[in-house]
């Protein structure tokens, strides 16, 4: 594709008939024939890597300001390279999103569970549906890992093209506030969008400066994308704010308040391999009994959202119920079998609201003791660390504070911050190495105990000093159980 053709739909200066065979924003992947896009992020500026891309053979650059490169380097200057990438990425892959039925889900909690359940229901109902989100990418049974909940726009359009090539015509995406803020989904023609809930999170360096900015970023999905249908949580106090200005069809779901999809008669259940919740879904005057393989009101709410989303494509609650009864979500209230009489739970609850909800839900099972193992991500605000400490102090019988993804912050500093917020008298210990913390919790567990390992969930790594190190919590729990059983 000629460079001039590639940039024809963006505002720019500069021109060239150079042939472009690839687009990248990673200088390590730049080569002859590629266009290197200099993205400006919270911590890194792609312009500083332009010379590295040049050394790798790249001669075409999309920049926000000219950089010092040899004369044979073509520089196309535009106001915002992230916004431009969304346009040229779509054009480069032939605008595949235009041929797809796209579902976008946003909210503080529940995006992953709702999206995965939606994809499973749609697929079993005869509408093969891909998934993009925190748990990676699934297209026709083929899995890919992702660096972000919502990939960069270039990756999205590559994935959309891959879906079409695989014969998949539906896709559900988790849409993060960062994706909305940084143009990752600009121009994506969402057909149906959903709002799960909103609470104070993702505020701090590199994220949102305050709650107002976070809240408004979320609302962009409903105010700016012209979807035909919006599904929203009528129980959430911010649902009216999210609905402002949406001109399409609106479908509500809820448990506490009357809704188009209303959940009632909730009851927890416990089996050998799962903790769950069942409830009745009332829709259009008909009642459908639904079982979900994760417990709590939040799980029921996420399932209702998925049922409503699928309903927007003609799938009935009865069809949805048949899928939900046998569909677990990895890393969300995932039961790890190990020692007799003990229940080990892996869950992604990584902020105060999620951890409070998880612990209160597990309390309803009347355990002998409820133990909680958690840490907090490095580089985030004190608010999250305090809220996590408050939750575990209030609802756990014993807490082990450990590392999560400390990244470039010393894990001991993060742990010290959390410990400083634990309530007076709340029993806890600090173990920096998360593997050691897991072993300690497994050894400590007695018959009748429930142990919650919070924060990692589906993740298969720990982020330490900028490096992703292999770390799968469920595997380590099983290792610890096997060692203790010897």
List the predicted regions and their residue ranges.
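ATP-dependent carboxylate-amine ligase
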Residues: 1-12, 30-35, 305-318, 322-331, ...
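Residue-level signal for inorganic ion chemistry
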Residues: 6, 34, 53, 88, ...
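Short, hydrophobic beta-strand segments that form beta-sheet elements in well-ordered domains
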Residues: 22-25, 57-64, 173, 229-233, ...
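Receiver (REC) domain switch/active-site residues of two-component response regulators
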Residues: 59, 191, 397
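Phosphate-binding loop of NTP-binding sites
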Residues: 85-234, 240-246, 365-366, 485
């Amino acid at each position: 594709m000629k460079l001039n053709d590639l940039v024809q739909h963006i505002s720019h200066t500069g021109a060239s008939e150079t042939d472009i065979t690839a687009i990248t924003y990673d200088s390590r992947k730049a080569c002859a024939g590629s266009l290197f896009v200099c993205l400006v992020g919270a911590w890194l500026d792609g312009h500083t890597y332009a010379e590295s891309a040049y050394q790798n053979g790249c001669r075409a650059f999309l920049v926000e300001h000219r950089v010092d490169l040899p004369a044979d380097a073509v520089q196309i200057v535009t106001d915002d390279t992230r916004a431009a990438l969304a346009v040229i990425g779509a054009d480069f892959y032939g605008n595949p999103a235009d041929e797809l039925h796209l579902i976008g889900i946003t909210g503080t909690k529940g995006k992953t569970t709702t999206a995965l359940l939606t994809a499973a229901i749609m697929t079993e109902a005869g509408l093969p549906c891909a998934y993009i989100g925190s748990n990676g990418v699934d297209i026709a049974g083929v899995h890919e890992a992702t660096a972000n909940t919502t990939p960069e726009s270039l990756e999205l359009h590559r994935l959309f093209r891959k879906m079409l090539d695989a014969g998949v015509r539906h896709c559900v995406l988790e849409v993060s506030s960062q994706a909305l803020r940084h143009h990752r989904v600009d121009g994506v023609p969402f057909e149906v969008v959903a709002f799960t809930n909103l609470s104070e999170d993702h505020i701090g360096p590199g994220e949102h400066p305050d709650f107002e900015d976070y809240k408004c970023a979320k609302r962009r999905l409903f105010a700016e994308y012209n979807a035909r249908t919006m599904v929203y949580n009528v129980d959430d106090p911010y649902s009216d704010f999210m609905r402002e200005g949406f001109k399409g069809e609106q479908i509500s779901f809820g448990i506490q308040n009357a809704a188009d999809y209303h959940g009632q008669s909730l009851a927890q259940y416990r089996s050998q391999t799962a903790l769950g919740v069942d409830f009745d879904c009332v829709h259009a005057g008909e009642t459908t009994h639904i079982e979900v393989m994760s417990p709590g009101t939040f799980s029921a709410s996420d399932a209702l959202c998925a049922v409503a989303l699928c309903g927007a494509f003609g799938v009935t609650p009865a069809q949805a119920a048949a899928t939900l009864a046998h569909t677990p979500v990895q890393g969300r209230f995932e039961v790890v079998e190990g020692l007799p009489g003990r229940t080990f739970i892996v869950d992604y609850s990584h902020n105060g609201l999620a951890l409070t909800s998880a612990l209160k839900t597990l309390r309803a099972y009347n355990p002998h003791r409820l133990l909680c193992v958690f840490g907090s991500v490095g580089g985030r605000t004190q608010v999250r660390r305090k809220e996590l400490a408050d939750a575990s102090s209030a609802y756990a019988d014993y807490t082990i504070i450990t590392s999560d993804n400390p990244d470039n912050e010393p894990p001991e500093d993060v742990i010290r911050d959390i410990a400083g917020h634990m309530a007076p008298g709340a029993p806890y210990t600090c173990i920096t190495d998360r593997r050691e913390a897991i072993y300690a919790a497994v050894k400590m567990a007695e018959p009748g105990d429930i142990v919650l390992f919070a924060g990692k969930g589906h993740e298969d790594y720990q982020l330490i000093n900028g490096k992703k190190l292999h770390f799968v919590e469920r595997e380590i729990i099983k290792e610890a159980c096997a060692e203790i059983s010897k």
